[in-house]
Curated annotation (Swiss-Prot):
Cofactor binding comment, as recorded: Binds 2 Mg(2+) ions per monomer.
InterPro entries: ATP-dep_AA_Ligase (IPR052032), ATP-grasp (IPR011761), ATP_grasp_subdomain_1 (IPR013815)
Keyword Lipid metabolism applies: no
Residues that, per the record, bind substrate: E273, H309, T310, E311, R328, F329, A330, G331
Site (Plays a key role in restricting the N-terminal substrate specificity to small amino acids such as L-Ala): W332
Protein name: Alanine--anticapsin ligase
Chain sites annotated for binding Mg(2+) 2: E311, E324
Class of the enzyme per the UniProt entry, highest EC level: ligase
Length: 472
């Protein structure tokens, strides 16, 4: 069979490059279009070059030789991408036409909507234009969820301080304030007290002015205010060590939702995720409720052909509360870990759906496997504040080393990999925690509880050597 050609809009996020490009290139010819060259790391660029039959970079971002250099690491691209959505759509259509591609995909949250419009113009399978907008704008997303038959929650669009005051009066506290256009929990804030609410809103609103997003990202209001979803851990789990929310990965094919795998989580730092354990140990009844909620949510968004990453709060009486859903792959190593545990390559599966629709070998339900658990974990400054190695009042610090001591692993849990920020790395503690991952590690074991306990012990006992500054 002749290999089909897929256009990849290459940028940050989603399925990590170290898996995506090799997996995709095994079955498809890849053409990589890079709309934001400054958002590509050196290792990402090397993988793009290695596995693509052609690479197209947006020429408008090259002014000097320095612009051809790629950073070693990047979490969020802070340079400007000032092209309006229509111009981005036209560029995608142009590149797709040059190579007569059979499908278009991206791992980046911010290009979901322009990509959907390009797919529609070219007659290619995609998420769907309105559905992509629903999945990108959290106000539209919540409205779609509330219509879809999942748990309905109070919410209000917020642009101004007056809007926020009105939301406070209507919803009350505790209240969640979310930017409608970002990802990775950036800017998500829990408002607990009426007395400090306006100051919190002003702080977040001011801080988000420093977070650059492409001009092509559009929204009707920059924030959504929502009632807080209260979890009820003991109604779902029989053992300790996890969190009161999960994520579930799935695939949409011709408008039908196909669940793939559920990840358990360890407790968050605020709204910043700390670890994902694949697969979930929840019982069959719990999994069924989660799948039902995810199906209603993603089909309710109107999504047609795409990957989905859906986050669900585990509430009282086993009610599944929809947090949000994205029309893309999960980040971190959640997609590679599904392959490690189940042997299913979701990168290839998505491209199969985009090229062949329901002829792809879609799962008949959640994947099942012999007992083996893989955890994808990060350490943040807050962990070292909690274990007493960083003062609560520190404003920044310079890392000298981070080490995991012997004797912290439980059962047959093993460390598959560990990496930490290089010596000399400066960490600004005024940033949102999600920007400040300072170490990452992967664990593997035959018992999920032992893996979860090992994560906890590492968080409590990891050794940080650093120089820090205190406020004057």
């Amino acid at each position: 069979m002749e290999r089909k050609t897929v256009l990849v809009i290459a940028d940050l996020g989603g399925c990590p490059p170290h898996m995506f490009y090799k997996s995709a290139a095994e079955k498809y010819n890849l053409v990589s279009f890079i709309p934001r060259p400054f958002a590509i790391t050196a290792s990402h660029a090397a993988l793009i070059e290695k596995y693509s039959v052609a690479v197209i970079k947006d020429k408008d971002y090259f002014k000097s030789l320095a612009d051809f250099e790629h950073p070693d690491s990047i979490y969020w691209a802070h340079e400007d991408h000032d092209k309006p959505e229509e111009e981005v759509v036209e560029e995608i259509v142009k590149v797709a036409g040059m190579f007569a591609v059979d499908a278009i995909t991206t791992n980046n949250e911010l290009f979901i909507a322009p990509m959907a419009k390009a797919c529609e113009r070219l007659g290619l399978r995609g998420a769907g234009v309105q559905a992509a907008e629903n999945a990108r704008d959290k106000n539209k997303m919540r409205a779609a969820f509330n219509r879809a038959g999942v748990k309905s929650i109070k919410n209000k669009r917020v642009t101004t301080l007056e809007d926020f005051r009105a939301a406070l009066q209507e919803i009350g506290t505790p209240l969640i304030l979310k930017p409608t256009y970002l990802a990775s929990s950036i800017g998500v804030t829990l408002i607990k007290e009426m007395e400090t609410a306006e100051a919190e809103f002003n702080r977040v609103n001011e801080y988000l002015k420093s977070i650059n997003v492409p001009k092509a990202v559009t929204f009707e209001a920059p924030f959504i205010a929502e009632e807080f979803l209260q979890g009820e851990y003991d109604d779902w789990y029989e053992t300790s060590g996890y969190s009161d929310y999960i994520s579930i990965e799935g695939i949409m094919a011709d408008g039908e939702y196909f669940p793939v795998a559920i990840h358990d989580k360890t407790p968050q730092i605020g709204f910043t995720e700390t670890s994902h354990i694949t697969p979930s140990i929840l019982d069959d009844d719990a999994k069924r409720k989660i799948v039902e909620a995810a199906k209603k949510a993603n089909e309710g968004l109107g999504l047609e052909n795409c990957a989905t990453h859906t986050e669900i709060k585990l509430m009282k009486n086993r009610e599944a509360g929809l947090i949000e859903s994205a029309a893309r792959f999960a980040g971190w190593n959640m997609i590679p870990n599904i392959k490690k545990v189940f042997g299913v390559d979701m990168a290839q599966l998505l491209l199969d759906v985009l090229c062949f629709g329901k002829e792809a070998d879609l799962p008949k339900g959640l994947l099942e496997q012999e007992p083996c658990y893989v955890a994808d974990c990060h350490l943040y400054p807050q962990h070292f504040k909690e274990n007493g190695q960083l003062p609560e009042t520190a404003v920044d610090f310079v890392i000298e080393s981070i080490d995991i001591p012997d004797g912290v692993l439980k059962g047959d849990t093993e460390i598959v990999s560990f990496s930490a920020a290089e010596a000399g790395t400066s960490v600004d503690l005024r940033l949102f925690e999600a920007f400040n991952s300072i170490a990452a590690f992967e664990l593997k074991g035959s018992n999920s509880g032992d893996v979860a306990e090992s994560i906890k012990q590492i968080q409590q006992q990891a050794k940080l050597t650093a120089k820090y500054a205190l406020p004057v």
